[in-house]
Amino acid sequence: MATVPEPTSEMMSYYYSDNENDLFFEADGPRKMKCCFQDLNNSSLKDEGIQLHISHQLQNKSLRHFVSVVVALEKLKKISLPCSQPLQDDDLKNVFCCIFEEEPIVCEVYDDDAFVCDAPLQSLDCKFRDKNQKSLVLYNSYELRALHLNGSSVNQQAVFRMSFLQGDENSNKIPVALCIKEKNLYLSCVMKDGKPTLQLEMLDPRVYPKKKMEKRFVFNKTEVKKILEFESSQFPNWYISTSKAEAMPVFLGNTKGGQDITDFTMEFSS
């Protein structure tokens, strides 16, 4: 990256004239005169060639004017030019390396997995039923079951807190974490006996949920016409599933249709 020093008032007053086209300067001081340089050590007064013009007046000139002056002076110090040839833009290109100092550009590389968005974590409280209208109920503290509820038994239905996690905004799959509210029991996917298995884990409410959850807690939610599916992020193509039979455990399955139900409806809970 090229850097140019800021012009001081003394330099500005020394180098600039009132006429914008007078970007010519003499080497002998602040008197207004014109001088032609045939050689760095041998100058003579002529009416052609590169000329320097000095002015006492301080003007609010742009950086472009100042750079033009500096470039011209550096050119005169290092290179002699025939008076018969006017100074061209191409003549200044070779001088830039003498005036500008290159600085390295340091690019910091970030790990996408370590980056966490500053936006607050969003969540909602809800209840789920499978497409056969079976509700999800917490059974024996650490097991979810799906069964039909009637009358007062409806209160047994588990209330979930669904937290929306950081993920790919361009994907139609929304990463979420599912927690049984007031129990801090999170649905997670682990490998047991060589098979992906759904289980409940109790987590510290002071730490969880967080924007970047461990992969076993992440489910990719898809929704089509208010029908939801929850695919395990840890085990792709494995879904939260229920059996068509009554009061069976909720499990992780990789079969859509048949005896496995992977479609759910959701209702908000106050």
Curated annotation (Swiss-Prot):
Major site of localization recorded for this protein: cytoplasm
SMART domains (UniProt xref): IL1
UniProtKB keywords: Cytokine, Cytoplasm, Inflammatory response, Lysosome, Mitogen, Pyrogen, Secreted
Chain positions of site Important for interaction with integrin: 173, 181, 183, 192
One Gene Ontology CC term in the entry: extracellular space
Propeptide stretch(es), residue numbers: 1-118
Cell location: Cytoplasm, Cytosol; Secreted; Lysosome; Secreted, Extracellular exosome
InterPro entries given in the database record: IL-1_CS, IL-1_fam, IL-1_propep, IL1/FGF
Functional description taken from the UniProt entry: Potent pro-inflammatory cytokine. Initially discovered as the major endogenous pyrogen, induces prostaglandin synthesis, neutrophil influx and activation, T-cell activation and cytokine production, B-cell activation and antibody production, and fibroblast proliferation and collagen production. Promotes Th17 differentiation of T-cells. Synergizes with IL12/interleukin-12 to induce IFNG synthesis from T-helper 1 (Th1) cells. Plays a role in angiogenesis by inducing VEGF production synergistically with TNF and IL6.
Record's subunit section: Monomer. In its precursor form, weakly interacts with full-length MEFV; the mature cytokine does not interact at all. Interacts with integrins ITGAV:ITGBV and ITGA5:ITGB1; integrin-binding is required for IL1B signaling. Interacts with cargo receptor TMED10; the interaction is direct and is required for the secretion of IL1B mature form. Interacts with HSP90AB1; the interaction facilitates cargo translocation into the ERGIC. Interacts with HSP90B1; the interaction facilitates cargo translocation into the ERGIC.
Misc remark: IL1B production occurs in 2 steps, each being controlled by different stimuli. First, inflammatory signals, such as LPS, stimulate the synthesis and promote the accumulation of cytosolic stores of pro-IL1B (priming). Then additional signals are required for inflammasome assembly, leading to CASP1 activation, pro-IL1B processing and eventually secretion of the active cytokine. IL1B processing and secretion are temporarily associated.
Protein name per its UniProtKB record: Interleukin-1 beta
Gene (name only): IL1B
